[in-house]
UniProtKB/Swiss-Prot annotation:
Classification via PROSITE patterns: RECF_1, RECF_2
Subcellular location field: Cytoplasm
Source species: Rippkaea orientalis (strain PCC 8801 / RF-1)
Listed name of the protein: DNA replication and repair protein RecF
Residues binding ATP: G30, N31, N32, A33, Q34, G35, K36, S37
Biological process terms in GO annotation: DNA replication; DNA synthesis involved in DNA repair; double-strand break repair; SOS response
Keywords: ATP-binding, Cytoplasm, DNA damage, DNA repair, DNA replication, DNA-binding, Nucleotide-binding, SOS response
CDD domains hit by this protein: ABC_RecF
GO MF, one example: ATP binding
Length: 380
C-alpha cells in the first residue's frame, strides 16, 4: 500500500498544495503551527473518515472558504485508486472513489489503511474509557469496514432509547397518565430488544479484536521493555458474556437491562451497553493508568501501535501507512530505535518533527524531507 500523491485544497491552512511522495519514508520538517499535522490529518481522514482532533467538517475548511477537498492517488496490490473527500460548510461531505460518487461511507472505507501515533495517544492509558473505546472502534473500522455501519446502528438505537427513557421519567411524575405510561413501557421493551441485538454485534467484535491484538502487543512490549515488564490487556464489557454466540450475548444484554430497569427509569438514560465498555492495561500486575510511569505508559502505547500495524497487515494482506505526529521527541533513544527498526523497509511512513537530530544519517539519506512553512510545502 503506497500513497503516491496528496492534494489539499482549502484544507486547514493549505490553499492549494500538491505533494508527491517518492520515498517510503517522508519527514515533514517545520516549526509548530505551520501545518505539519494537517497533512497527517488529511491522510487519517482518507483512512477512517474521522479525525482525532475534531468532529466538525467546518474545522477542516480554510477560513473564508465554504468548500475544502482532499484528493489522493493510492497504489495497492490490486491496482491504483483515486480517492477524494469534498468537505462543505454548510452541507454534507461527498466521497468519490475512482471519480465515481459514493452514496455510502461503507464503500469508501478500506480504500486506504493507516495507523496514527501521536502524543495524544497517551490518553489510551491515562484518559477516559471513551478514548479507549474510540481507539478500538477506529481499528475495527479498518479491519472490517461494515463495523462502521454496525456502530452507527447501535448509537441510533441508543439515542432513541434514551429519548424514550427521558420521556418515561417525566410521565412517571405526572398524575392520570397510566395509559400513556403503559404504552411507553411496551415501546421500551421493543427498544430493549433492539439494544440487545445491535449492542451484541458491537461487543462481540470488540472482544474478538482485543483477543487478536493481545499476543502481538505483549510480544512488542516485552521486546521494548527488555523483558522486564509483563503486559496484560483485559476487555471490560459493560455486559458480561461467556460464549461468542449471538443469542447468548443478546440474552445477557436483556438480563442486565431487566436488572438495571429501575435505575434507568430513575436516571432517564441507558446504563447498559457497549457505550460503557472499557479496556484495562496492567504492567506486572499493576494498573498502568494509575501507577505506570510516563516511560512505562509510552512503552505500552508504542507496543499497542506496533501491534495495530501487524494486525492490519495480517488481516488485509498489505502493510498500512504509519503516521507519526511529533512522537519521536516523546520517546527515549531505546524506544525510538525500536520504532525506527520496525518501520525500516516495511511501512510507508510519514513523520512530523521540528528538528532532524533524532534520526541517524542512514535514515535521513533514505527519506524524503519536506519543509513545511505557513501552509506551504517544498523539498528541503
Amino acid at each position: 500500500m503506497y500513497l503516491k500523491t496528496l492534494h489539499l485544497s482549502a484544507f486547514r491552512n493549505y490553499r492549494e498544495q500538491q505533494i508527491e511522495f517518492d520515498h517510503q519514508k517522508t519527514i515533514l520538517l517545520g516549526n509548530n503551527a505551520q501545518g505539519k499535522s494537517n497533512v497527517l490529518e488529511a491522510v487519517e481522514l482518507l483512512a477512517t473518515l474521522k479525525s482525532h482532533r475534531t468532529n466538525r467538517d467546518r474545522d477542516f475548511i480554510l477560513e473564508g472558504e465554504t468548500i475544502g477537498q482532499i484528493t489522493a492517488k493510492i497504489e495497492r496490490n490490486y491496482g491504483t485508486s483515486d480517492l477524494a473527500i469534498t468537505l462543505r460548510s454548510p452541507g454534507r461531505r461527498t466521497l468519490t472513489l475512482n471519480h465515481e460518487h459514493l452514496r455510502r461511507h461503507l464503500e469508501f472505507l478500506g480504500s486506504l489503511n493507516a495507523v496514527q501515533f501521536s502524543s495524544l495517544d497517551l490518553d489510551l492509558v491515562r484518559g477516559s474509557p471513551d478514548a479507549r473505546r474510540n481507539w478500538l472502534d477506529t481499528l475495527l473500522v479498518q479491519l472490517e469496514p461494515i463495523y462502521a455501519h454496525i456502530l452507527q446502528q447501535y448509537y441510533q438505537v441508543l439515542r432513541q432509547r434514551n429519548a424514550l427513557l427521558k420521556d418515561l421519567r417525566k410521565t412517571a411524575t405526572e398524575e392520570g397518565k397510566s395509559d400513556h405510561l403503559s404504552a411507553q413501557m411496551t415501546q421500551l421493551h421493543l427498544w430493549d430488544q433492539q439494544l440487545a441485538e445491535t449492542g451484541s454485534r458491537v461487543t462481540r467484535r470488540r472482544a474478538r479484536v482485543i483477543e487478536r491484538l493481545i499476543p502481538l502487543a505483549q510480544i512488542w512490549h516485552q521486546n521494548i521493555s527488555g523483558g522486564q515488564e509483563i503486559l496484560q490487556i483485559d476487555y471490560l464489557p459493560n455486559v458480561s458474556w461467556q460464549e461468542d454466540e449471538p443469542l447468548e450475548v443478546q440474552q445477557a444484554f436483556l438480563a442486565k437491562i431487566e436488572q438495571r430497569r429501575l435505575a434507568e427509569q430513575q436516571l432517564g438514560t441507558t446504563v447498559v451497553g457497549p457505550h460503557r465498555d472499557d479496556v484495562e492495561f496492567t504492567i506486572n500486575g499493576t494498573p498502568a493508568k494509575s501507577y505506570g510511569s510516563q516511560g512505562q505508559q509510552r512503552t505500552l502505547v508504542l507496543a499497542l501501535k506496533l501491534a495495530e500495524l501487524k494486525l492490519i497487515e495480517e488481516v488485509i494482506g498489505e502493510p498500512p501507512l504509519l503516521l507519526l505526529d511529533d512522537v519521536l521527541a516523546e520517546l527515549d533513544p531505546n524506544r525510538q530505535n525500536q520504532l525506527l527498526e520496525v518501520i525500516q523497509g516495511r511501512f510507508q511512513t510519514f513523520i512530523t518533527t521540528t528538528y532532524l537530530h533524532s534520526f541517524d544519517a542512514q535514515w535521513l539519506q533514505s527519506s524524503q524531507i519536506l519543509k513545511v512553512e505557513a501552509g506551504k510545502i517544498h523539498p528541503c
